[in-house]
Amino acid sequence: MSLLLPDSGLLFWMFVAFGVVFVILAKYGFPIIIKMVEGRKTYIDQSLEVAREANAQLAHLKEEGEALVAAANKEQGRILKEAMEERDKIVHEARKQAEIAAQKELDAVKQQIQIEKDEAIRDIRRQVAVLSVDIAEKVLRKNLQDKESQMGMIDRMLDEVLTPNKN
C-alpha cells in the first residue's frame, strides 16, 4: 500500500462517509449556514445603505452649514457696511454741526467786537467833543477878551450859518 495512493476499498468507504456527511450537511447544515450568510449579507447591505444615507445627510448638512456660514458672512458684511455708512453719516453730521456752531460763535464774536468798536468810537467822539469844546472855550476866552473881537466873531459865525456850505 502506497501512502499517496489509497486502495479502492478505502476509497469507496471514504466516498460513502463523505456522501453521508454531505447529505446530512446538505439537509440540515447548509440551509442554516446559507440562511446565516444571507442574514449577514442583508445586515451588511442595510449597514452600507445606512452608511450611504448618513454620508448623504452629512454632505447635505455640510452644504447647509457652508450656506449658513456664507449667509452669515454676507449679513456680517452688510451690517458692517451699514455701520460704516452710519458712522460716516454721524461724523459728517457732527462736523456740519461743529462748523455751524463755530460759525455762530464767530458771528457772535464779530458782532460783539463791532458793538465794542462802535461804543469805543462813540466814547472817543464824546471825549474829542468835550476836549474840543474845552479848547474852543479857552481859545475864545483868550481871543475874545474885548467887546469888539466878540462882536466880530459873532458876525463871522452868523455869516457862515446863513451862507450855504461851499464845500
From Swiss-Prot:
One of its GO terms (molecular function) is proton-transporting ATP synthase activity, rotational mechanism. Keywords: ATP synthesis, Cell inner membrane, Cell membrane, CF(0), Hydrogen ion transport, Ion transport, Membrane, Transmembrane, Transmembrane helix, Transport. It holds the Pfam family ATP-synt_B. It is a single-pass membrane protein. GO terms for cellular component: plasma membrane; proton-transporting ATP synthase complex. F-type ATPases have 2 components, F(1) - the catalytic core - and F(0) - the membrane proton channel. F(1) has five subunits: alpha(3), beta(3), gamma(1), delta(1), epsilon(1). F(0) has three main subunits: a(1), b(2) and c(10-14). The alpha and beta chains form an alternating ring which encloses part of the gamma chain. F(1) is attached to F(0) by a central stalk formed by the gamma and epsilon chains, while a peripheral stalk is formed by the delta and b chains. F(1)F(0) ATP synthase produces ATP from ADP in the presence of a proton or sodium gradient. F-type ATPases consist of two structural domains, F(1) containing the extramembraneous catalytic core and F(0) containing the membrane proton channel, linked together by a central stalk and a peripheral stalk. During catalysis, ATP synthesis in the catalytic domain of F(1) is coupled via a rotary mechanism of the central stalk subunits to proton translocation. This is ATP synthase subunit b. The lineage of its organism: Bacteria, Pseudomonadati, Bacteroidota, Bacteroidia, Bacteroidales. The gene is atpF.
